């Protein structure tokens, strides 16, 4: 049966190639087109849910029919051909149903996409309109802000109050019936009144100028008359000199000071005479005065008989008191120490005025039993300074004059004979008493004319005027320089603590225009903290980290790179430059021991510091060194080779112009800045 049916079907396939079928195909195409358009309309009428149920049912029927055909064919009987044909026809019908459902699904999908696209276009149009409206709103807000911020010239004029305006201005200007209800007209009227008043004042000013010229002419005439009297007065004063000497009538304050100076101890007297002479000859801003009790000073030089009588009386009193109670050994030692450290009741005060109206007050004392001089210092400024945290020790009386001359820290006595005196009363060192007594600097002894030979210690040394005169000018200049440098550091530290490196206009040429690295931290640290830093060991071992120095820690950042700088500030700044030690935390920890470029950066600020001194007296050296460190960190990071294994842009793009990025086997970077060309090169 199957072979017969196949033979019957073959002619159908052959006939399909003829021309008559082409006409049929054309007609069927037109009918198909009609059906296609009818199916598009039919999509809107059909329920997708029912189509889905029909699809499931059709698939189940196809599965059932295929299973039945499979069962019938497996039986192999000859009577099942008709049943198979019927099921095949039913299957074809179901396939046509599936095709139709597929077409309907595609039509629905196309319509859904079209609707989605139309909705998206509407949303985009609305979004564009919204953005346009937002831009318009922003523009209007900016214009409104500009209008609100606009200030007219008349707003800068201080007009009289409304009460004064209506009470003093004439009705022709005030126009109260109009200006009371109109602020604009009121302002115009007040401006007219201001103009009228200024015209009147200008007229008065011209009258006052004319009167002033007349008065000046009268003053000039009287001055000429008085100047003609000056020679007569001078002759009268010259004639009265014998009378003044006869009556002992001092008219000058200097004469009184000279009288008081007679009671000064020899070292303070030498200081007073030499300082007064220096002030009169070289420095008019230096003022010299004497403080203290003259009566107590006179009591020290009583005649011996009186003193012996007093001593006998006091001995008798002491004998009576000793019978009552016996002082302990500790009390006796304390009394002996106080007596040994006793100061002379008179002291010499020097006020050294600097250019910025700051004054250095120096009070000189004389320890009578130790035969040494001490000094206490205090700095006052014309304007009260806001003391930064890191500038706490700059102007302190204990350290402001430390190491004015190298090694002269003023913590021990300059007189070798004092040590034997200290042993008798149990004083280990004078360091414990300097805050109360003052600092016995070596230059203080020289200003008093004292010189203590170390080879032959002497308890009593006579002062020498020539020694005081030879050191006076140099010491005064050093004192002024010290105060000015400390005040300059005081102001600079206030900026450094806020992350600002102040660079003056005179020093702008030392650095490129753009510096990306920035200072984020500037703090003071102790001597012990500095010695504990691992990257400062070579400074400590070299003996450059003394306890008289000041120590600071700076942190400079750019991106992920952090550069620590430990700074040693010598008391003799700026004649002695600061010393920097660096530690870079970026891709590991880098110091001068493991990175030659870090050593080169330290050399740039420590060795080549003269390029950064700026104009004399080089008070900008420290801030210029810090700014140079920021520039060096930029060069270090920008010239670092980029790892190609990491995608994306470089963290530090090269912005500095360098003639050559590396040199030598150690690949040294170009750290030298060349002005005005603006490029970096190797040294």
Swiss-Prot record:
MF annotations from Gene Ontology: mRNA binding
Numbered residues of crosslink Glycyl lysine isopeptide (Lys-Gly) (interchain with G-Cter in SUMO2): 153
Disruption phenotype: Embryonic lethality seen before day 5.5 of embryonic development (E5.5).
Upregulation: Up-regulated following CSF1 stimulation.
Keyword Coiled coil included in the entry's annotation: yes
Cysteines joined through disulfide linkages: none
UniProt-listed InterPro entries: THO_Thoc5 (IPR019163)
Post-translational modification: Phosphorylated on tyrosine upon binding to activated CSF1R; which causes a dissociation of the two proteins. Phosphorylation on Ser-5 and/or Ser-6 is required for nuclear export. Phosphorylated on Thr-328 in insulin-stimulated adipocytes.
Residues with the Phosphoserine modification: 5-6, 307, 312, 314
Region (Interaction with THOC7), start-end ranges: 2-199
Modified residues (Phosphothreonine): 328
PANTHER family for this protein: FMS INTERACTING PROTEIN (PTHR13375), THO COMPLEX SUBUNIT 5 HOMOLOG (PTHR13375:SF3)
Protein name in UniProt: THO complex subunit 5 homolog
Organism whose genome encodes this protein: Mus musculus
Taxonomic lineage: Eukaryota, Metazoa, Chordata, Craniata, Vertebrata
Gene responsible for this protein: Thoc5
